[in-house]
Amino acid sequence: MSAKSPEVSANAITVRRARTSDVPALRRLLDAYSRDRILLDKATVTLYEDIQEFWVAERADNADNAEVVGCGALHVMWEDLAEVRTLAVNPALKGAGVGHRLLGKLLETARLLGVSRVFCLTFEVDFFTKHGFVEIGETPVDPDVYAELLRSYDEGVAEFLGLERVKPNTLGNSRMLLHL
């Protein structure tokens, strides 16, 4: 196997819980995606507030300096439902298995929390389909849960619910769901 093989690259990656010291690296990683409107722009304060939801992928060089090359978050929305959010990989490493490793860790976390369904809103339909997600049309919650979720101030929850005020953020995205 050559040194440029995606599997070799993925094996050099460590996935771990994010720390507050990772926020500047997350900011740099996410800025390109938000500029291109692939991901919602998140205020830096929101990254700090939500850091406990994040996992990061880092790559160490020969001098043991680690670089954050990917991230993803799992946001619990209800007792049986969570959302994969802010899944991003350094564009130079796309296709190297970094996103796969991060998503695997997020799904493992969902299982440990007792969540049975995981939702995402994405442009990367092929990636999520390969991991068992299926496209859905409507918001997959009962009316009582929907009414309770309306009380959330979280923009991601508003997107999940398809609220009119966030429609511009979601144009072209696909709603996808995975049953664990």
Which stretches of residues belong to each language-model region?
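C-terminal "cap" of GNAT-fold acetyltransferases
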Residues: V141-L180
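Conserved acetyl-CoA-binding loop-helix of GNAT-fold acetyltransferases
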Residues: G95-E108, C120
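A generic "binding-loop/recognition-motif" signal
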Residues: D22, D80, F123-E124
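A short, internal acetyl-CoA/4′-phosphopantetheine-binding micro-motif in the GNAT/acyltransferase core
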Residues: L87-K94, F123
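Conserved active-site alpha-helix within GNAT-family acetyltransferase domains
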Residues: L112, S116, T122-S152
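Short amphipathic alpha-helix that is part of the acyltransferase structural core
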Residues: S2-L40, E58, D64-E67, G172-L180
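A conserved beta-strand-loop-helix scaffold within acyl/acetyltransferase catalytic domains
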Residues: D41-W55, R59, G70-V89
